[in-house]
Amino acid sequence: MSASPETSSDPPMQRRSRLSAERVLNSSLELLEEHGFDAFTVAEVSKRAGISVGAIYARFGNKEAMLRAVHAHGIERMVEQHAAAASPDRVADDLHACVVDAVEMVASVFHGNEALLRAFMRLGAVDEVVSRRGSAGSKDLARRFKEKVLAHRGELVHRDPEVAVDVAYRMAYCIFARRVMDGPAYESDLVISWDELVDEVAAACSAYLLERRTGVTTA
């Protein structure tokens, strides 16, 4: 863990530079959340952060490099959220409760960062570096989902618990990602609230993981 600005032994100029960069990154995240990727401008970031456009370019080089740094900063923040949401203090007593908890964990990351993730997804579509980093963040969330559910491995009826839990994660991830990217009525006219959607996805994942299916061997 890095030292805080107040306790850091960095020279004052270096410390000021780091704090200025943090202001730029945080202002950029706010701008992306409020107005999305298409409306993002260095001039607006400059105004919000109180740092000149020239100083921003001197620090980051160009807009592409700046957006990559902003994305890295945002993903780091989300990974911290993953860790908090997957806290060992929240271990469920049985598989059903554990699946519900795991699905709610995934939903909370998407719902809590809806506008920012939408901007990141659009940026990732045109920037391979951003896409790879976003994939790594998604896989971190997958790992935490699997750790939660596989803590009750003995209750799983699927012949391959690892595959089953991976598919359950993909179900939740893809449904919530689609909701964030395209809104509640892209693929269907029926509009479902976030809370109801989370409940239904949790029920679907629980049914998939808990119910024995005709003709499927568990050996």
Predicted regions and their residues:
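N-terminal intrinsically disordered/low-complexity leader segments
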Residues: 1-19, 184-185, 213-219
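Amphipathic alpha-helical linker/stalk segments
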Residues: 8, 12, 72-98, 117-118
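Helix-turn-helix
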Residues: 23, 31-65, 69
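Short hydrophobic clusters on alpha-helical segments that form packing/core surfaces
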Residues: 24-32, 74, 78, 106, ...
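Alpha-helical DNA-contacting segments of helix-turn-helix folds
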Residues: 67-74, 124, 134-137, 141
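Hydrophobic alpha-helical connector segments
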Residues: 69, 83-112, 165-168, 198
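Hydrophobic alpha-helical bundle segments that form small-molecule/ligand-binding pockets
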Residues: 86-92, 112, 117-118, 123-128, ...
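Hydrophobic/aromatic-rich alpha-helical bundle segments in the mid-to-C-terminal region
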Residues: 118, 151-202, 212-219
